[in-house]
Design a protein with these regions (language model features):
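Alpha-helix capping/hinge segments and adjacent helical runs
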Residues: 25, 192-267, 327, 335-362
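C-terminal amphipathic alpha-helical interaction region
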Residues: 259, 265, 269-362
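Flexible, glycine/threonine-enriched loop-and-boundary segments that flank and lead into catalytic domains
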Residues: 1-40, 188-204, 208-224
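Conserved catalytic-core motifs characterized by acidic clusters
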Residues: 71-73, 96-110, 135-151, 174-190, ...
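A glycine-rich, basic-preceded beta-loop-alpha segment at the flavin cofactor/substrate interface
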Residues: 62-67, 71, 83-114, 131-148, ...
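A short core secondary-structure module
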Residues: 22-67
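C-terminal helix-coil-helix/basic helical segment that borders enzyme active sites and/or dimer interfaces
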Residues: 165-199, 214-215, 288-301, 305
Length: 362
């Protein structure tokens, strides 16, 4: 078993006599277990009180291996340096974490941390792909000049650089919210909604961005001697881990409906950039109207979360990035003056300034 419908879990937990109310024996099957070489695992299983969270050690205190059998390692598209296994539990010893029947609520803090990890990893993949593309274009000569000096390639690279900086800016802001969440209600609310927004959008944008960066290297990017194939295989993973795109988009709606203040925290964050760019202001106003229009929210969830992500990225770039970067982002992502593929930035963008910001002197 595995996947997003955690309440469909049929792995069972039976109270053990060793320490009543604390130790349990787990019986069941886990379709996906990431990093099976770890010393301990957080596991959801159904006990008498309902779905509960348990800490399951790999090795017991007396040195014996716990009753956890690795049925096989998964043959994955990418992420091969990190093992994923299918495991069977035959009465494995585990310790109750939190209250019985409140497993999802108990484990959600871990999920929020790993969702931020997914955003961080995807932003890093974007950055590495961008650096490879820019370095190649600055040193590769074709048709009488360096690739980076050719207007269309400069457009492509600058567009990739905008995507990378926007992803990194959002990731850093979410990390800051996570650091400050304890003791700061507004930061906690922003972390709650923003992490799911960032997980959806940054991870979703990584595969096409990495694919475009690979194309900048031509055939050299498609051979295994290059790092690009590995980046491309890795790129889709973070959209799947810790909830696919639909799961995170629906989680944003759930938070907005059930957790008072998260939407206000979002717009409070966006309000700090008010007046900095007309296109951003218009986008934020349209977003508020979309949220107020309460019909078909589930159907429109991806559209809404995309708009939230772009608003957050735009606001951060308007506040903290050079004018050339913020203006290019707002024009191409918020102003309706960009295309669907990378390399469709509108006229007037200072591509040289964007690229020098992204990779000075590379």
């Amino acid at each position: 078993q595995g996947g997003s419908d955690v309440r469909a879990n049929i792995t069972t937990a039976v109270a053990d006599d060793e320490v009543p109310g604390f130790t349990y024996r787990l019986v069941g099957h886990k379709w996906f277990c990431s990093a099976p070489m770890c010393d301990a695992f957080l596991v959801l299983a159904k006990s008498r009180g309902g779905l509960s969270c348990f800490l399951m050690p790999r090795v017991l205190s007396d040195g014996r291996h716990n009753a956890m059998h690795l049925a096989r390692l998964k043959d994955k598209l990418g992420n091969r340096s990190n093992a994923s296994a299918e495991i069977e539990l035959h009465g494995a010893l585990a310790f109750l974490v939190g209250e019985e029947g409140r497993g999802v609520r108990t484990i959600v803090d871990m999920v929020n941390c790993t969702r931020l990890d997914c955003v961080t990893g995807s932003a890093a993949l974007m950055r590495q792909a961008l650096v490879q593309a820019v370095h190649h274009a600055r040193h590769r000569h074709a048709f009488g000049s360096r690739l980076v000096e050719q207007p269309l390639m400069a457009n492509v690279l600058a567009d990739l650089a905008l995507e990378s900086e926007a992803a990194t800016s959002l990731m850093v802001r979410l990390a800051g919210a996570a650091d400050q969440a304890e003791g700061d209600e507004q930061e906690e609310r922003l972390r709650r909604i923003g992490t799911a927004v960032g997980k959806y959008w940054v991870c979703k944008r990584t595969p096409p961005m990495v694919a475009e960066a690979l194309e900048c290297l031509g055939g050299n990017g498609y051979v295994e001697e290059s790092v690009m194939p590995r980046l491309l295989r890795e790129a889709p993973l973070n959209s799947i881990w810790e909830g696919s795109g639909n799961v995170n988009a629906l989680d944003v709606l759930r938070a907005a409906a059930k957790e008072p203040g998260v939407v206000d925290a979002l717009f409070g964050e966006l309000g700090q950039a008010a007046g900095g760019d007309r296109r951003l202001d218009d986008h934020v106003g349209a977003l508020r109207k979309e949220l107020d229009h309460g019909t078909d929210l589930e159907y429109r969830a991806r559209r809404l979360v995309e708009a939230m992500a772009l608003a957050l990225q735009g606001s951060l770039l308007v506040r903290f990035a050079p004018t050339a970067v913020a203006d290019a982002f707002c024009a191409s992502r918020l102003g309706g003056d960009g295309g669907h593929a990378f390399g469709t930035l509108p006229s007037g963008v200072d591509c040289s300034a964007v690229l020098e910001r992204a990779a000075p002197g590379l």
